[in-house]
């Protein structure tokens, strides 16, 4: 084999390079097919956990416990209460009426006291509800000396350091004594504080009258006082019609400024996983998912062992590792939630007169849903790894990589100005406008300004001079100047990339053309394409030769043209596409000689045409 047949960089022969190319194509197609099967299985698994009834169950429970009007005040509900008096009205009215459904139409008895309540006649109240209070100690804040004679008591905001652990009030019942928090229980993030488990717990009864009497007793003995900072109402429901649990938490916060803030959480989750035939089909998809996870982990370990440190230089490999990590976390959360659900349901069946802490399960189940949602997001993003062989996607990736430095520099300048305006808005309007009440809210408010969703009247009313100045200058510098600079950077770089591609720069191979070429090869093997191509080629050659004879060319010129055509066809056959080719395709000595002779003949023809044009121009003059 001559030396010219070896690739100068790696000494790769023509045959080896072709074999490597075909192997890379086959590997890519196999990996794409396998990944699509995994993605379809993941979609079935993910959407199989979501039930449209979840929204409607949350909606109906929200309307019952959050939007029901208070007694003697149709304009107020749990959503809008702002005082302790209104809170007790809610506890003794809409809450009790919503929890205890003891009669059917016409006052027909619906259930006995030993059984659970059926909310809306379809949702079983699991166990008994629980009311929990968190308090802070007196004298937990510092009072200015001049006001110490006027202020004898001082209750600060809720923190773990300020929390009150001592008994208070009557001190004879559990609701007046402190219950330690569980280390594994999740914390709750409210409007004005972050609250942990434990506190002063009131366990309700299955009897509506007993529960109402207990609420009246707590109200008369000031169970909620100045030291109260949060009251939680927790209970859980189960709807067998749709096999869904609804875990409900109503929260009333009593900030140190006075007043009352309410919030709520409704979690509809499917804790009993395998009930119907469709559930068992989802279970089979879960098994397949675990098999895929095991196979992908083995593949990535082999790649790491083969490429060593070079493996970590690819962005797609980092995405692959992130995807595997998320899949592993999803499997771990799923196993933990199922195990805890089994244990908790067993305890509930043994003792129906206790409070079942399903909020703990809902908390971890929501984390599982979030992890699986992020997993499927990155799983779809990974498709770009395969379609990046397309010319358009290659141009997009080249554009982003080429303008990355400019984008980073622009981002630094943008966030400096953006942060400056956010601090200005927070300091000027924070005490009067809800959108600027915190620094985080100020940042989101500015993004809303960019999107055109903003209440200008609010900042104008807060400060009629600085409000319009802030708004106009922010729109001018951020919206008209900076965002257009960003678009100009992207547009200019994309134009450069388009120009590079127009003069011959292409991706190594395009997936669409590879699939098209594979289909053509199959058709040729089936003798559906090959015969037709030969027929057209023969007819085209015959027509050209006959036309040349009619135009007066002699046989030597015709034979020379046919020889040049054969050389051209041989080169085109080897380099079948300018869009799918290697940057270092090997050329043999014979091919180089034919290419050189072809170029010489083209130069002669060009010179001949130039002389003819000169003669024609002289005749015209």
UniProtKB/Swiss-Prot annotation:
Please give the superkingdom of this protein's source.
Answer: Eukaryota
Compartments in which it is found? Membrane
* UniProt xrefs under Gene3D superfamilies: 1.10.287.70
From the UniProt record, list the coiled-coil ranges. Answer: 521-551
Task: Identify the main location.
Answer: membrane
InterPro entries in alphabetical order: PKD1_2_channel (IPR013122), PKD_2 (IPR003915), Polycystin (IPR051223), Polycystin_dom (IPR046791)
Expression (tissue specificity): Expressed only in testis and heart.
* Extracellular side, ranges: 53-277, 336-360, 428-468
In this entry, the parts of the chain located on the Cytoplasmic side of the membrane are 1-31, 299-314, 382-406, 490-621
Query: What Pfam family does this protein match (any one)?
Result: Polycystin_dom
One GO molecular-function entry: calcium ion binding
What GO cellular-component annotations does this UniProt entry give? membrane
Segments passing through the bilayer = 32-52, 278-298, 315-335, 361-381, 407-427, 469-489
A single Gene Ontology biological process assigned to it is: monoatomic ion transmembrane transport
Keyword Ribonucleoprotein assigned? no
Entry keywords, A to Z: Coiled coil, Glycoprotein, Ion channel, Ion transport, Membrane, Transmembrane, Transmembrane helix, Transport
Glycosylation positions in this chain: 115, 138
Record's subunit section: Interacts with TRPC1 and TRPC5.
Instruction: Please describe what this protein does.
Output: Exhibits a lower single conductance but no spontaneous channel activity. May function as a regulator of calcium channels or a channel component involving Ca2(+) homeostasis.
Q: Which family does it belong to?
A: Belongs to the polycystin family.
Q: What is this protein called?
A: Polycystin-2-like protein 2
From which source organism is this entry?
Mus musculus
Instruction: Supply the gene name.
Output: Pkd2l2
């Amino acid at each position: 084999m001559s030396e010219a047949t070896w690739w100068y960089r790696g000494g790769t022969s023509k045959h080896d390079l072709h074999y490597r190319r075909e192997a890379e194509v086959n590997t890519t197609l196999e990996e794409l097919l396998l990944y699509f099967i995994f993605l379809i299985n993941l979609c079935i698994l993910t959407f199989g956990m979501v039930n449209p009834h979840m929204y409607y169950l949350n909606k109906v429970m929200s309307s019952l416990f959050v939007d029901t009007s208070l007694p003697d005040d149709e304009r107020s509900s749990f959503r809008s209460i702002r005082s302790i008096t209104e809170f007790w009205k809610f506890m003794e009215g809409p809450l009790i009426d919503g929890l205890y459904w003891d009669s059917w139409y016409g006052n027909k008895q619906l259930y006995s006291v030993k059984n659970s309540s059926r909310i809306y006649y379809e949702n079983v109240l699991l166990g008994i509800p629980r009311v929990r209070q968190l308090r802070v100690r007196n004298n937990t804040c510092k009072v200015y000396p001049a006001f110490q004679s006027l202020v004898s008591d001082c209750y600060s905001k809720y923190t773990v350091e300020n929390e009150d652990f001592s008994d208070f009030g009557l001190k004879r019942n559990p609701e007046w004594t402190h219950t330690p928090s569980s280390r594994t229980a999740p914390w709750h993030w409210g409007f004005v504080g972050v609250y942990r488990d434990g506190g002063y717990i009131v366990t309700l009864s299955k009897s509506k009258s007993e529960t109402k009497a207990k609420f009246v007793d707590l109200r008369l003995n000031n169970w909620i006082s100045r030291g109260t900072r949060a009251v939680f109402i927790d209970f859980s429901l189960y709807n067998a019609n749709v096999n869904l649990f609804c875990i409900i938490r109503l929260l009333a916060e009593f900030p140190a400024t006075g007043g009352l803030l309410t919030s709520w959480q409704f979690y509809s989750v499917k804790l009993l996983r395998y009930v119907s035939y469709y559930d068992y089909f989802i279970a089979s998809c879960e098994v397949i998912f675990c098999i895929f996870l095991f196979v992908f982990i083995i593949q990535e370990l082999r790649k790491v062992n083969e490429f060593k440190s070079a493996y970590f230089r690819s962005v797609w490999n980092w995405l692959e590792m992130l995807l595997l990590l998320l899949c592993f976390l999803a499997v771990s959360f799923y196993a933990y939630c199922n195990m805890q659900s089994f244990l908790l349901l067993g305890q509930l069946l043994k003792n129906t007169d206790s409070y079942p802490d399903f909020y703990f399960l809902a908390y971890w189940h929501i984390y599982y849903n979030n992890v699986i949602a992020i997993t499927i997001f990155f799983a779809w993003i990974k498709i770009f790894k395969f379609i990046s062989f397309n010319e358009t996607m290659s141009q997009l990736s080249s554009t982003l990589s080429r303008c990355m430095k400019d984008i980073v520099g622009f981002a630094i300048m943008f966030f400096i100005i953006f942060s400056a305006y956010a601090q200005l808005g927070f300091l000027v309007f924070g005490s009067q406008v809800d959108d600027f009440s915190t620094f985080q809210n100020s940042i989101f408010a500015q993004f809303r300004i960019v999107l055109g969703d903003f209440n200008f009247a609010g900042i104008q009313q807060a400060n009629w001079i600085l409000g319009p100045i802030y708004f106009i200058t922010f729109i001018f510098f951020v919206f008209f100047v900076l965002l257009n600079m960003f678009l100009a950077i992207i547009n200019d770089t994309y134009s450069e990339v388009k120009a590079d591609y127009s003069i011959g720069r292409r991706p190594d191979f395009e997936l669409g053309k590879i699939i098209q070429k594979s289909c053509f090869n199959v058709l040729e093997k089936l003798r559906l394409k090959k015969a037709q191509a030969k027929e057209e080629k023969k007819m085209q050659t015959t027509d050209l030769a006959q036309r040349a004879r009619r135009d007066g060319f002699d046989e030597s010129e015709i034979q020379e043209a046919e020889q040049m055509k054969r050389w051209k066809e041989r080169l085109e056959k080897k380099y079948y596409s300018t869009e799918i080719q290697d940057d270092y395709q090997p050329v043999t000595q014979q091919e180089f000689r034919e290419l050189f002779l072809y170029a010489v003949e083209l130069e002669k023809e060009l010179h001949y045409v130039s002389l003819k044009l000169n003669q024609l121009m002289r005749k015209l003059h």
